[in-house]
Swiss-Prot record:
Residues 347-542 form the Histidine kinase domain. Gene3D superfamilies: Histidine kinase-like ATPase, C-terminal domain (3.30.565.10), PAS domain (3.30.450.20). The gene is citA. This is Sensor histidine kinase CitA. Changing residue 152 to A: Strongly reduces citrate binding.
Length: 547
């Protein structure tokens, strides 16, 4: 069994156990090292080739210059070894060549750096081209001093006859020393480059880790799968858009609520304005989050929120969540009929209990006439109010609300007075019964609370509701505590209230939302001497170009 596959598996297993950040770092380090080694090999090869060429040309030029010296030609012709030595020794001392050799026409040495070699034949077998063909050239051969790079040139007399040869050589060992010096000069820059690559690799791996939220790929993959399942499983419609207002994600609930038949891939990349016909909500105040606003998406009333995705203090996109208004019960149930009817029934029960107790006391005292008179008085008073409401308010939901609010006022020690001009035979088409009752109920509740907080004012609340003409007019006047000037401009904002209770701050915001939805307007004035007058103008038929 080969050890190589086993060793490879161990390395692979060890590498797989490293964190993603370290794997990226090691991979870049390995790749960088391979590249650096390849570059080193290439530079070494190029440098060696260039060095051999340059040194070879240097040896050749020296050999040609020496062989052309008239003094040397004359000395070789006379075989004057002393003269040859006197000519060559100074040159060798100034040259960087390892050796300079001079031979005769038969290749026997006339001069050599080693005197013992004089008279012997030149080694290497590469002198024939110079001696026979009178050529100058560069060769690499092994001689008496070892392998060397040598330049050879013939010595010719005045007639052109070859009478000798000059060989200038550089040993391979000397060339390798020079090559090592040149390569070593590159080691520091290459080491600096390698360290820079290591630093960049580390920074890059840290950047990748940061971009992946410090998670491993499998963790990120699992998170994306979980978020995808969560995105599709919530009951709210969810839409994600980028900074160019193009859809990047939309869940199944959103497509169902908006009656969109296209699958998600078809909607991805489309501008939100081409899919949903409510542009103000998406484009208004891009850096501000919106929460629980009543808007209309594709002619469907929804309660929507918008959350900005902020990166480097700039919005990179938004996530819009919404639910059909018909499905929202948290606000409507608390601010409309369920809570109101419970309060109204308690008020009626409380007043009837007090009345029965009073009548029982009169009967016990045998004051029958006074008991009968009280019964008739209460019956006439209540009947007048009930008859007035039944006659002037033809919507049963509104009539029931007003009767309950009348008894609730009496329970609180207040008096709800209806203006004789009250008359409602139709309601705005843009509002449902629930929304309409929420408007009136919240205005009356607000007036009750304000009146209870003002000990000096009258305890009367005046109510006018009239649908004559093209709009419904609602006017609620109280003698309560009024509106703080610091809150007057913000009284209709969600969560803004002058009450200490955490449950307040929603009613007037809801009133404004419904009125604006129906294309109406609200006027707030100070009452004299105390209190506030709220006047609402709501068109019976909504102007489609409004808002």
């Amino acid at each position: 069994m080969s050890i190589y596959p086993m060793y490879t598996r161990k390395i692979t297993h060890w590498f797989a156990r490293r964190s993603f950040q370290n794997r990226i770092f090691l991979l870049i380090l390995f790749t960088s090292t391979i590249v650096m080694l390849a570059m080193s090999w290439y530079l070494t090869d190029i440098t060696e080739e260039r060095l051999h060429y340059q040194v070879g040309q240097r040896a050749l030029i020296q050999a040609m210059q020496i062989s052309a010296m008239p003094e040397l030609v004359e000395a070789v012709q006379k075989r004057d070894l002393a003269r040859i030595k006197a000519l060559i020794d100074p040159m060798r001392s100034f040259s960087d060549a390892t050796y300079i050799t001079v031979g005769d026409a038969s290749g026997q040495r006339l001069y050599h750096v080693n005197p013992d070699e004089i008279g012997k034949s030149m080694e290497g077998g590469d002198s024939d081209e110079a001696l026979i063909n009178a050529k100058s050239y560069v060769s690499v051969r092994k001689g008496s001093l070892g392998s060397s790079l040598r330049g050879k040139s013939p010595i010719q007399d005045a007639t052109g006859k070859v009478i000798g040869i000059v060989s200038v050589g550089y040993t391979i060992e000397q060339l390798e020393n020079w090559l090592s010096l040149q390569i070593s000069s590159l080691l520091i820059p290459m080491a600096i480059m390698l360290l820079l690559l290591l630093f960049c690799a580390r920074r890059f791996s840290l950047h990748i880790k940061k971009q992946m939220l410090n998670m491993e790929p499998q963790q990120l993959s699992q998170l994306l799968i979980q978020q995808s399942v969560l995105f599709e499983s919530v009951f709210e419609g969810l839409i994600a858009i980028d900074s160019d207002y193009k859809i990047t994600a939309i869940n199944q609930t959103a497509r169902r609520l908006l009656n969109l038949s296209q699958p998600e891939p078809t909607l991805i990349g489309k501008r939100i304005s081409s899919v949903i016909s409510q542009e103000v909500f998406f484009y208004d105040a891009p850096q501000t989050n919106k929460k629980d606003e009543i808007v209309t998406f594709n002619q469907i009333k929804v309660i929507a929120s918008r959350m900005a995705v902020i990166l480097n203090n700039e919005p990179q996109g938004w996530v819009i969540s919404f639910r059909s208004k018909d499905d929202i019960n948290t606000l409507s149930l608390q601010l409309s009929q369920v809570q109101q009817y419970a309060d109204n029934l308690r008020a009626v029960q409380h007043e009837h209990r007090n009345l029965i107790s009073t009548i029982a006391g009169l009967l016990f005292l045998k004051r029958y006439n006074q008991a009968l008179e009280l019964i008739q008085q209460q019956s006439e008073s209540h009947q007048k109010v009930i008859d007035f409401i039944a006659r002037n308010f033809q919507d049963n939901h509104l009539a029931g609300l007003l009767i309950g609010k009348y008894y609730r006022a009496k329970e609180l020690g207040l008096e709800l007075i209806f203006d004789p001009a009250c008359f409602v035979d139709r309601l705005p088409t843009a509002l449902s019964h629930n929304e309409w009752i929420s408007i009136v109920g919240n205005l009356l509740d607000n007036a009750y609370n304000a009146s209870l907080r003002q000990p000096q004012g009258s305890k009367q609340i005046e109510c006018l509701i009239n649908s004559d003409g093209q709009e419904v007019i609602i006017e609620i006047a109280d003698q309560g505590c009024g509106i703080d000037e610091a809150l007057r401009d913000r009284i209709f904002e969600r969560g803004v209230t002058s009450s200490a209770s955490k449950d307040h701050g929603i009613g007037l915001w809801l009133v404004r939302s419904y009125v604006e939805q129906a294309g109406g307007s609200i006027v707030v004035e100070n009452n004299i001497p105390f209190g506030t007058i709220f006047t609402l103008y709501i068109p019976l038929t909504r102007d489609e170009h409004h808002g």
